[in-house]
Amino acid sequence: MPDNKPLPNIPSPELLAQLRDQEGFRASPYLDTQGVVTIGYGTNLEAHPEYLNLPDVEGMVRRGLRGRLLLNELTGRTWSRERAEAAMLDEVVQCREALYVRCPQFVRLVEAGELPRAEVLLNMAYNMGVSGLLKFKNTLSLIDGALDGRNSWAAVESGLKSSLWWRQTGRRARALGRQMRTGVYA
C-alpha cells in the first residue's frame, strides 16, 4: 500500500451489495460458466482450496483436481450465507491489497477520492481475478487519461465495451460501465 496511508472504506457497503446481487448465492458447489467449481457468492474453490476445510480434498486441489472431479468430491457439502459472506469479504480484501500493489490506476482512483470508480476495478478483480483485470491495458490507460483530463470517463466506459468480458458478462458489465462513466454506484 502506498505510503502506508489508511485505507478509505473499501470495500464499501455498496460494493458488497453489488457483489451479492451480481454473483448470487449458491449454498452448494456448482460448475460456473467456465467450468470452475464455485460456491457461495462466486467463491472459486479451485483458486481458494483453503476454504474447503477438508485437508484430503484441499490436497487433491493443490495436486490438480479440477472441475467435475472436484465437484464430485464435494457432493452434499453446503455453505451458509454467513460462511459465504465471510469468504466474499476475505476475497475482496485480498483483491484490494493486490490492486494496491499491482494496479497504479486503482491507487490513483482511491487517492483522487473516486471510490465508486476504484470499486469498479475491485469488482472486476473479484470476478476475473487481479491478473485478468490487469489484461485490460487499454482501459487502464484510459483511466489514467481520464484522471489527467486527457479523455472522458465515457471513453473509459467505451474501452470496457470493446472487451470480450463486456460481451460475456451482460448486466454486470453494463452496470459497471455506467458506474465508471458517472462515478455513481450502479
Language-model region placement:
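Primarily short, surface-exposed interaction patches in extracytoplasmic proteins
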Residues: 139-145
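Short, hydrophobic/amphipathic alpha-helical patches that form generic packing surfaces
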Residues: 123-128
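Acidic, aromatic-lined catalytic clefts of primarily extracellular/periplasmic carbohydrate-active enzymes
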Residues: 1-120, 133-134, 147-186
